[in-house]
């Protein structure tokens, strides 16, 4: 059933054979919708690759759980503002075990790493998915939270490096990076540090921002992401953000893997 849901998610198809067909129909009426026949009329090979390779193979690969594949895919879609597939991927993520409060935090996190407008575009889609599935305020994160523990030594080292490199020229950015990102956003408890890192790494690769990949991939692995999971996340992203972005990421990731203790 989850594979079939994924098929629909990938193409935003109307013929989703699940109990939620009627629930999702209303929210997609105003959005562009494709059927398998639509795709075959334009690109029959694409339809075959979608069913046989992407959904029949990539989404079934071991090494990265379906929940994590949904997190990676959502992060890529939001980072690139690709709204046509968001309704079904939000639904698929929920089916795969991503909680509404986690989706909320993913969108909030990506406002900082992919831009406010992209996050707001995701909100516009997610609100209808949440409404169709009766997701209420009790299932969402509160604004004021008890933050996760801060790695004081690691944060002091990061802050000192950034201050030394950029503090004199970009005081505002340096201040917000410390006060808002690493002493606030990253400590919100409704998205685990590992998952928050996975979202960040996925968004960086999705937008070809490799300069920040080394520290964030290291942070992800410090937070519990394994090398196998990181490799599979990059494999997943090849199909959603394109081979060139992934081939730009692989040398960076390979270097991170090689330099970490074994």
Predicted regions and their residues:
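Winged helix-turn-helix DNA-binding recognition segment
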Residues: 98-102
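Bacterial N-terminal signal peptides
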Residues: 6-15
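A short structural micro-motif
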Residues: 78, 96, 109-116, 205, ...
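Short, structured motif recognition centered on aromatic/hydrophobic residues
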Residues: 69-77, 86, 106-107, 196-204, ...
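Preference for long, well-ordered alpha-helical segments
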Residues: 118-119, 209, 229-248
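Positively charged n-region of N-terminal signal peptides that target proteins for export
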Residues: 1-4
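Alpha-helix capping and inter-helical loop/turn segments
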Residues: 81, 207-211
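Acidic, glycine/proline-rich low-complexity segments that act as flexible tails and inter-domain linkers
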Residues: 20-67, 80, 87-91, 95, ...
């Amino acid at each position: 059933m989850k594979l079939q849901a994924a098929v629909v998610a990938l193409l935003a198809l109307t013929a989703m054979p699940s109990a939620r067909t009627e629930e999702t129909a209303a929210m997609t009426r105003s959005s562009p919708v494709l059927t398998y026949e639509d795709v075959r009329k334009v690109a029959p090979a694409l339809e075959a690759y979608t069913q046989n390779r992407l959904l029949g193979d990539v989404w079934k690969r071991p090494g990265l759980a379906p929940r994590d594949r949904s997190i990676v895919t959502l992060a890529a879609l939001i980072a690139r503002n690709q709204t046509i597939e968001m309704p079904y991927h939000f639904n698929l993520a929920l089916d795969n075990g991503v909680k509404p409060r986690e989706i909320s935090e993913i969108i909030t996190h990506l406002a900082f790493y992919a831009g406010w407008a992209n996050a707001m575009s995701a909100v516009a889609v997610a609100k209808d998915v949440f409404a169709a599935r009766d997701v209420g305020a009790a299932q969402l994160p509160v604004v004021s939270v008890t933050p996760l523990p801060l790695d004081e030594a690691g944060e002091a080292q990061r802050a000192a490096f950034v201050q030394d490199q950029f503090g004199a020229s970009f005081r505002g950015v340096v201040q917000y990076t410390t006060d808002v990102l690493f002493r606030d956003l990253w400590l919100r408890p409704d998205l685990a540090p590992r998952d928050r890192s996975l979202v960040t790494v996925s968004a960086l690769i999705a937008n070809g921002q490799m300069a920040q990949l080394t520290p964030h991939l290291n942070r992800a692995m410090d937070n519990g992401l394994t090398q196998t999971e990181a490799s599979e996340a990059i494999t997943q992203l090849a199909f959603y953000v394109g081979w060139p972005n992934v081939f730009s990421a692989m040398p960076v990731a390979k270097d991170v893997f090689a330099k970490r203790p074994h």
